[in-house]
Amino acid sequence: MKVYTKTGDTGTTALFGGTRVPKHHIRIESYGTVDELNSHIGLIRDQNISDLYKNVLIEVQDRLFTVGAILATPPEKETLKNGQPRLQNLGIVESDIEFLENEIDIMEEALPPMTHFVLPGGHTTVSYCHIARCVCRRAERLAVHLNDMEPTDELVIKYLNRLSDYLFVLARKLSHDLNADEVKWIPRK
């Protein structure tokens, strides 16, 4: 299979099921941002961090491919002509969200309680986590916007919301593990 098809040379692309839409369509923005997020998470995984975190991030990347597939499938193409779901055995389930919540809880047990907002930074790896968190929030906003236009799996939105929480806590935990300065934001008076 060739990487290039030339079918997108006029500014359109195909969704799952074959429907062609402009490349600026909210559905493309939505799953394209999830793809961008996945790349940022790969960058975090490539850092010198514990294999425990790397394994969680591999699971997250797998789930993000599923999220992308869901977002790339318009509602009218979710079911094949034979009545079977187009994305059979693919989906986000409550246990995916619970997995993130459990990982958040484990990390938070080892951290001092938050008393202030924290400025992103302190170490390159921590900064990568904050960038991924921001991209995740953008992906979530786009998925919500898409959901306002066409029904979208609500667990996708919930997963992206929880993932941004996970990435924030991971940034704090890595800051702690790396003995990086966690600078509190204290508003000027």
Stretch-by-stretch model annotation:
Residues M1-K189:
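Phosphate/pyrophosphate-binding loop motifs in nucleotide- or prenyl diphosphate-using proteins
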